[in-house]
From Swiss-Prot:
Protein name stated in the entry: Isoleucine--tRNA ligase
SUPFAM superfamilies in alphabetical order: Anticodon-binding domain of a subclass of class I aminoacyl-tRNA synthetases
Protein keywords: Aminoacyl-tRNA synthetase, ATP-binding, Cytoplasm, Ligase, Metal-binding, Nucleotide-binding, Protein biosynthesis, Zinc
Primary site of residence: cytoplasm
Database matches in InterPro entries: tRNAsynth_Ia_anticodon-bd, Znf_FPG/IleRS
Gene Ontology MF terms in the entry: ATP binding; isoleucine-tRNA ligase activity; metal ion binding
The protein's Enzyme Commission number: 6.1.1.5
Entry domain remark: IleRS has two distinct active sites: one for aminoacylation and one for editing. The misactivated valine is translocated from the active site to the editing site, which sterically excludes the correctly activated isoleucine. The single editing site contains two valyl binding pockets, one specific for each substrate (Val-AMP or Val-tRNA(Ile)).
Origin species: Klebsiella aerogenes (Enterobacter aerogenes)
Function: Catalyzes the attachment of isoleucine to tRNA(Ile). As IleRS can inadvertently accommodate and process structurally similar amino acids such as valine, to avoid such errors it has two additional distinct tRNA(Ile)-dependent editing activities. One activity is designated as 'pretransfer' editing and involves the hydrolysis of activated Val-AMP. The other activity is designated 'posttransfer' editing and involves deacylation of mischarged Val-tRNA(Ile).
A GO term from the CC aspect: cytoplasm
Reaction(s) the record says it catalyses: tRNA(Ile) + L-isoleucine + ATP = L-isoleucyl-tRNA(Ile) + AMP + diphosphate
Alphabetical GO biological process terms: tRNA aminoacylation for protein translation
Length: 92
């Protein structure tokens, strides 16, 4: 089913969708005002503004921008990519 395929991407779903975050929820639990796809049966979409600050390096909105003193202007993910071993991605 579609939800299982999307959930298989895990945290990388947000990269596939080019967004700061993404969640897959049960179709039946979608609010009445959710957008419903005419092309993909079983797909409803709800959009909301991302929380946190925009990282100037990756442009993702996240709550950990500035948490690392040595790299106070970027998010934790970017710190890992710039000063650490970097993130390991499987899909995107």
């Amino acid at each position: 089913d579609l939800a299982a395929k999307l959930n298989a991407l895990g945290e990388e779903l947000r990269f596939v969708l080019l967004t700061s975050g993404a969640n897959v929820a049960d179709y039946a639990q979608a609010p009445a005002d959710a957008w419903q796809s005419d092309l993909l049966k079983g797909l409803k979409v709800v959009l909301s503004k991302a929380e946190g600050e925009k990282c100037p390096r990756c442009w993702h909105y996240t709550s950990d921008v500035g948490k690392v003193a040595e790299h106070a202007e970027i998010c934790g993910r970017c710190v890992s990519n710039v000063a650490g071993d970097g993130e390991q991605r499987k899909f995107a």
